[in-house]
């Protein structure tokens, strides 16, 4: 039920989807939906948690890693790509919320914590001399994770690209550059 609901939220927008639309899409009654969740917002919360829990787990793993800040940052980028590929519809939905409800605001607060962690890693890597100092750490972080997040715009579940291949491509482009040597 959750996966099919997220599919509809991504197609129509969360605010543009009614419980009646969900029931029709799922082929069940509204009361059957309410048997499982208390509201459309509760359903949204479950979906956003599916995306955020994977991203938070990736960040927690990176926090405990040994190694340089740039190595940990690269690991965070790779893990974020893997989560995005594995949970594509859920991450797509997460990237489309704007804070219109308490559920959305909670998700955005959780996402901001992840953003701050990534920006701190970028700053530490700059301070260590492993990343260029001529671009602000927060800007670098936004650009880096903007590249990761842009995958939701073109990646399809039927894609032949594996999570590992995409993680390698993003990491190479971000950390080694696009220019041939």
Label every model-predicted segment.
Residues 46, 57-86, 141-144:
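Hydrophobic alpha-helical connector segments
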Residues 3, 7, 45, 49, ...:
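Generic detection of well-ordered alpha-helical segments
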Residues 4-42, 46:
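Helix-turn-helix
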Residues 61-62, 78-85, 93-100, 173-178:
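Helix-loop "lid/cap" segments that line or gate small-molecule binding pockets
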Residues 72, 83-103, 119, 153:
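Amphipathic alpha-helical segments used for helix-helix packing
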Residues 53-57, 86, 103-128, 137-142, ...:
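Amphipathic alpha-helical packing segments from all-alpha helical-bundle domains
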Residues 79, 135-153, 165-177:
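Hydrophobic alpha-helical segments that form the core
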């Amino acid at each position: 039920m959750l996966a099919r609901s997220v599919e509809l939220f991504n197609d129509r927008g969360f605010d543009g989807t009614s419980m009646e639309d969900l029931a029709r899409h799922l082929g069940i009654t509204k009361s059957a939906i309410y048997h499982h969740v208390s509201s459309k917002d509760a359903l949204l919360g479950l979906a956003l948690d599916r995306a955020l829990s994977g991203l938070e787990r990736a960040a927690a793993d990176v926090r405990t890693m040994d190694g340089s800040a740039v190595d940990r940052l690269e690991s965070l980028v790779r893990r974020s790509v893997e989560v995005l590929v594995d949970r594509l519809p859920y991450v797509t939905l997460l990237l489309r919320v704007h804070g219109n409800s308490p559920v959305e605001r909670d998700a955005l607060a959780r996402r901001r914590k992840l953003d701050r962690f990534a920006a701190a890693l970028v700053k530490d890597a700059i301070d260590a001399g492993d990343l260029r100092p001529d671009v602000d750490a927060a800007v670098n972080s936004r650009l880096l994770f903007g590249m990761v997040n842009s995958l939701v715009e073109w990646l399809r579940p039927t894609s032949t690209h594996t999570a590992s291949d995409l993680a390698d491509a993003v990491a190479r482009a971000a950390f080694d550059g696009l220019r041939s040597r």
